[in-house]
Structure formats: C-alpha cells, structure tokens
Amino acid sequence: MKKLKMKYMAMAVMVLGIATVSFFACRFTKENKDSNIYGVDLSHHNCVEDWDQVTASFVYLKATEGATHQDETFKRFAHNAQKRGILVGAYLFMTTSSSSEEQFQNFHQATAGIKMDLIPVIDIERQTKGYKVSGNELRKRVRVFVNLCKKHYGKNPIIYCSQPFYTKNFLGHFNDCQYWCGDVNAPVVLYHAIHQKTIKKVAGIKGNVDYNILNCKLKEIQL
C-alpha cells in the first residue's frame, strides 16, 4: 500500500510538472540561437549612408513618441527600405504623460500613407518622469493601445521592453501580444519573438545600431 501510494504521488508530481511547464511555455523558453534573420530599428538618431548596403531582413522605424512628436525620418526611411525589399514596421515610444487614445491617434496619423509589412510595436521602457502611474493603471493604458491596434491593423502589437520591466508589469497579462526583449548582451529567459541582441556596426549605416535577432518565423511578425 505504501509503495502504491508513493507511486501515485510520483505520478501526480510528474503530471503537475508537465502542466506547469505547459502553462508557462508561452512566456518561458530558450532562445533560438540558430536564427540568422536579423533586423535593425532606426530613428532620427541614425544616419543611413547607403541603403543598398543594408542587408537586414526587416527594419522597425520610430514613428512617434507620446501624443505629439512624430519622427521626421519615418516616411523617408520607410520608402527607402521598402524600395530595396526590406520589410518595414513602425513603433511608438509610449509615455505615461498622455492618454493611449491620443498616442494611438498620433501614431496612426504619422504612419498614414505607408503600407506597413510588420506588426506595430509599443516601446515602453520606463514611465515618464513626473507622470508615474500604478502597475494596474499602466496595464490598462497598454491594453487600450493594444485594442486600438487590433481594431485598425487586425493584429495585436508587439511589446518592447526589458525583461525586468516586463516581468514586473506585464507578465501574465499580455500573453496575446508577442514580446521583443530589449536586454542587450544578456541571456533571455522570457519567450520572445525578437531580441535586441547587441549594438553594432551594420553596413550602410553610420555608427552603431540596434541589432535584433528574430526568434520566430518571419511571417509571425508580419501584418
């Protein structure tokens, strides 16, 4: 009887372990170290000297920051990249100093006229100084933006931030959004679609640039 009881306990532990792994599989996994697809993210801080030398498979361009700022290089970079067959996506640098609705409207206006190839990205690395909100309020604001993206683009946006910031604020709340890990030169524990692997020199672009490795199939980040 004792042996049988131990056997059942062992089986229960095994089943629980499998269930736990399955439950968290959507957010915890190993990095795909064999990926050879890379992309860059650019803004007005970057200078592209020769687009013909840029061999990236995809590029994410800063479109807006907050509710008022629009990046002056967005449309020019987008046209030049797409002309050379590079897939283009846009990202918003989200702030906590204005509403999600206002920020989405700004993003939507800034990207008008550009047929984006990739799912939009919310870049939310920190809260705006002087406008800090609770974790719950932050999640509500991000969810509003997610819903607006889904309504207008047909897909939920990708969330970009560091692992500590994601774990503290979003883990378990945004499993319906893909994650872009912003931890440079660091191991990745969370499941991610994209990893900002390092900052390095890329042919055709002046100075160093964010170098991002794809950790999924390219079609998974396409619109």
List PLM regions with ranges.
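Aromatic-lined carbohydrate-recognition surfaces of secreted/lumenal glycan-active proteins
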Residues: 153-167
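Glycine-rich, charge-decorated loop segments at or immediately adjacent to ligand/cofactor-binding or catalytic sites
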Residues: 100, 165-173
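N-terminal Sec-pathway targeting helices
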Residues: 1-15
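Hydrophobic anchor at the start of a short beta-strand
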Residues: 88, 155-157, 179
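Substrate-binding cleft of extracellular glycoside hydrolase catalytic domains
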Residues: 29-55, 60-146, 150-152
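Structural recognition of alpha->loop->beta junctions
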Residues: 108-128, 170-191
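Bacterial Sec-dependent signal peptides at the C-terminal "C-region" and cleavage site
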Residues: 19-33
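Functionally critical loop-and-helix segments that line ligand-binding/catalytic clefts
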Residues: 29-53, 173-223
